[in-house]
Amino acid sequence: MKTLALVVVLLAASFSIHAQAVTSVYTPLDDKKCKTLESTDEEGGSYKGECRGVGGYKLHVIEGDLRQTVTIVDPKGKEHPLEFWNLTGAFNAVGETAEWRMRGKKPIALIVRLTVNERVDDPAYVKGYLVVAKITPEATCVTEFLAPTRSHNYEARKAADKSATRPCRFESTPD
């Protein structure tokens, strides 16, 4: 009987740890709200900005050749480039806001909108994808590149919440 009671207590404790609600916290990626680290107008221009994140994390927004990407900077200062240009070679831009998926006070994933110009001959033709990156002690990397659908945001959150078990889409190279 004591063994059964112990098993029930351990299962209940385990369930409460894993059942902790996942919430969202948002970081603006707008260059007016982020600190400019580098900027030049030479050769089409480039930009690197630092945006405040959560839990000691920061985001670097990087632009070059009319393409943007995000690098996650962990609390120890280690950079984890997400290298959005590996997802699409087309001109693109990150959205105005990044969504951190949080378990308690700890980020477990990041969702960023990536607007992609898929027709070189028609700059007005763009599609809004959602990029999901996992944040784990083992790896911080892109796990999903979700095409637009009616339930786009819901699907991205669902993928983010399960991203810890997903493989990286590609290996990133540290800066």
Question: What kind of feature is each model-predicted range?
Answer:
Residues T3-A5, F15-F84:
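Charge-rich, low-complexity N-terminal segments
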Residues R52, R67, R101-R103, R113, ...:
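Arginine residue identity/basic-tract feature
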Residues P75, G89-A90, H152-N153:
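Alpha-helical interaction segments
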Residues F84-A147:
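Short helix/strand-capping turn motifs
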Residues T140-D175:
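C-terminal partner/receptor-binding element of secreted or periplasmic proteins
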